[in-house]
Curated annotation (Swiss-Prot):
It catalyses: GTP + H2O = GDP + phosphate + H(+); ATP + H2O = ADP + phosphate + H(+); UTP + H2O = UDP + phosphate + H(+). This is Mitochondrial Rho GTPase 2. Atypical mitochondrial nucleoside-triphosphatase (NTPase) involved in mitochondrial trafficking. Probably involved in control of anterograde transport of mitochondria and their subcellular distribution. Can hydrolyze GTP, ATP and UTP. GO terms for molecular function: calcium ion binding; GTP binding; GTPase activity. Its EC number is 3.6.5.-. Residues 2-168, 416-578 form the Miro domain.
Length: 617
């Protein structure tokens, strides 16, 4: 909504433009009227809409045509004043003033016009019969007000309508020639209907209508008022009411009726509550609320985000099979102007046996998005109606920004639940199979997977009876060069092919170049463990290398034995959670034992504190 309103008064000489302004300000008819009134500014606190309003007078005798053109450009609304007793001043509306204001403007970008019939005290009848054909000819005319500067009749109403034409414009909502809502307005209201239809039955029940009414206007409708609304819709539409509720067509008809009856502000209140601006686009403030993430911090969905997303999942899981089919997923995202999840999502997350997105996989994908691109995540939550349905100021309440990693290291514990593991190794070592195995997919099933290839896989790993999210990112490079940004992560998995004698050279080089002094935990993984292990051409064997650099002994993986490798993903998660134990001992057994003991002690301490707190209460 505009922050201020600029009203320009035009019309033939002696029609009373200046008198109208002075009567409004002085609240009495002026005895002496100057040729032109100075610009008046009405403070926000004395206007009905609480917006500062500037009123500008124009006089042909004092101002040039160039000044007039400049004032028209600056104006938000133009009041064309005519004398109800002088027919020629009415004719000038059509032949002079409207062409002057909007002659070169395209449809939809015209300045709104209010027709003002002054000196109604000098005429017994109304001029509306003469004015109506003009109003029908020019769609930019919002309304016509007959008033009297002398009797102060309709003076405040005149400026209220002018203000309203700017703050609640008709043009973006309604086409007066076609007598129907514009396509952009239909799209916006359809999204609002979909968000408000909380059970996805395509009908707004009484409970949903009251929820909607309270959200937009602060109070629920009285039962009789609710019935009256439905009766009006039922009488005027063939499909507006169904099962005692309002359909989308009924909802659209109701808003059309508001506009046709001059109650544009009702529809605008609804639109603005759901984040729309004057062009019927969602505002940047709504879609992209400010969220500051310091260096070393990460972002995760919190309990509010989970709660909202689970409600959304249940709403669109129409067959209640705890999975979203492609059609159900498309419906879920129908309130967005584009499909936000590409086919790679099916390669990122665990799927059902039918290759549908399970509830668990759905939450995994949202966690992945929140971690990798939190601002895109906020945008998606905004489109889906998170602030409205969760009654929150904005989407940032769904996100937790974790504390800096350096503080976690100092405290030797973390409250984070999402960790990133870079899987690094030369091409052909089996990194993709390692990611697929994390999602419990066999190599035989790869032909059935609907997803496009992805460099990410996310799943949960149970650590001390708590689920943590582990993101695996495949880093595939042709040479031994790896940028520092590519190396940053919570834990690095350096993968080599046990059957390729040159494979480990790459891992050793990457470790020395990026991880040896980084403090990032590293786990060496020998892939293709079902094949015969050959001696590596590196100066040391992988085990000797790990011993020398105080790394845990190498782990082994085979894509043919996916069900036996759960412990590998657990150990990667452990290492990410407790980086301070990295390199604390050369023995693999001792390393994992220290990690396990650390986690157990932390869990026991937390339980003891909980019991002590409970007793105190």
């Amino acid at each position: 909504m505009k922050r201020d309103v600029r009203i320009l008064l035009l019309g033939e000489p002696k029609v009373g433009k200046t008198s109208l302004i002075m009567s409004l300000v002085g609240e009495e008819f002026p005895e002496q009227v100057p040729l032109r009134a100075e610009e008046i500014t009405i403070p926000a606190d004395v206007t009905p809409e609480k917006v500062p309003t500037h009123i500008v007078d124009y006089s042909e005798n004092e101002q040039t045509d160039e000044v007039l053109r400049e004032e028209i450009v600056k104006a938000n609304v133009v009041c064309v004043v005519y004398d109800v007793t002088q027919e020629e001043t009415i004719d000038k509306i059509r032949t002079k003033w409207i062409p002057l204001v909007n002659g070169g403007a395209e449809k939809g970008s015209k300045i709104p016009i209010i027709l003002v019939g002054n000196k109604s005290d000098l005429r017994s009848g109304s001029s509306m019969e003469t004015i109506l054909p003009i109003m029908n000819q020019f769609s930019e005319i919002e309304t016509c007000v007959e008033c009297s500067a002398k009797n102060l009749k309709n003076i405040s109403e005149l400026f209220y309508y002018a203000q309203k034409a700017v703050l609640h414009p008709t043009a973006p909502l309604y086409d007066p020639e076609d007598k129907q809502l514009k396509a952009q307005c239909v799209r916006a209201l359809s999204r609002i209907f979909s968000i408000s239809d909380q059970d996805n039955d395509h009908i707004l029940s009484d409970a949903e209508l009251n929820c909607f009414q309270k959200l937009c206007f602060g109070n629920p409708l009285a039962p009789q008022a609710l019935e009256d609304v439905k009766t009006v819709v039922w009488k005027n539409t063939s499909d507006g009411v169904q099962d005692n509720g309002l359909t989308l067509n009924g909802f659209l008809f109701l808003n059309t009726l508001f506009i046709q009856r001059g109650r544009h502000e009702t529809t605008w209140t609804i639109l603005r509550k759901f984040g729309y601006d004057d062009t019927l686009e969602l505002t940047d403030d709504y879609l992209y609320p400010v969220l500051r993430v310091s260096v070393g911090c990460t972002t995760e969905l919190n309990h509010l985000g989970h709660q909202f997303l689970l409600k959304l999942f249940e709403k669109y899981d129409e067959d209640k099979d705890s999975a979203l089919s492609p059609a159900e997923l498309k419906n879920l995202f129908s309130v967005l102007p584009y499909m936000p999840w590409s086919s790679t999502v099916y390669s990122n997350i665990p799927l059902t046996d039918d290759c549908y997105i399970s509830q668990h996989g759905y939450l995994c994908q949202w966690m992945l998005l929140a971690y990798l691109d939190v601002h895109r995540c906020l945008e998606h939550l905004g489109y889906l109606g998170y602030p409205i349905l969760m009654e929150q100021e904005c989407q940032t309440s769904a996100i937790t920004v974790t504390r800096e990693k350096a503080l976690d290291l100092d405290n030797r514990q973390t409250q984070r639940t999402v960790f990133l593991c870079k899987v690094i190794g030369p091409r052909g070592t089996g990194k993709t199979d390692f990611l697929r195995a994390f999602l419990q997919r066999s190599t035989e099933r790869s032909d059935r997977d609907p997803g496009a290839p992805s460099i990410y896989a996310i799943n949960t790993v149970s650590i001390a009876n708590q689920d943590k999210y582990l993101i695996l990112e495949e880093v595939d490079v042709e040479t031994e060069f790896l940028k520092a940004a590519d190396a940053a992560c919570d834990v690095a998995c350096l993968m080599y092919d046990v059957s390729d004698p040159d494979s480990f050279n790459y891992c050793a080089s990457i470790y020395k170049q990026h991880y040896m002094d980084s403090g990032i935990p590293c786990v060496v993984l020998g892939s293709k463990a079902d094949l015969v292990e050959v001696k590596q051409h590196h100066g040391m064997s992988p085990s000797e290398f790990c011993y020398k650099h105080r790394l845990p002994s190498p782990l082994h993986f085979s894509a043919l034995l996916t069900h036996t490798h759960t412990h590998i993903y657990s150990k990667l998660t452990w290492a990410a959670m407790y980086p301070h134990l990295n390199g604390s001992d050369m023995s693999s057994t001792s390393f994992w034992l220290r990690v396990t003991l650390g986690a157990t002690i932390a869990a026991m301490l937390g339980f003891a504190l909980y019991r002590a707190f409970s007793r105190h209460k």
